[in-house]
């Protein structure tokens, strides 16, 4: 399953899902092996690379989308200090935050009963924005390279 913040948070009502019901909730409803919470503890989940918590700058609407679903999500957002330069006027701009997308995914997975989560731990090694030699980033490379980024994943069932 691939999801950005909107898919993870369940932003917007689509495909019969209610607000706050994202792709993980939809997967649990549609995938027979994950339909019962008791089955989810045995499923191994792997989080792939994404923009990291030191680079993912978001507005209050993103923070609110997660907090409405789970108030504990507030821990995954760090306010960005917006200090103006000396003598500069302060604009009435909305606050900005650094969001920890891997931690938000792990919270969502834990709430659904998934206990075995590997892969992206939110460290800089997994950040697509700060690792240009390892990962394509549409945010970083889109204007220069177009939207032709590639990602491959292999998923296997183990008996």
Residues covered by each model-derived region:
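Active-site microenvironment for binding and transforming phosphate-containing groups
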Residues: 1-159
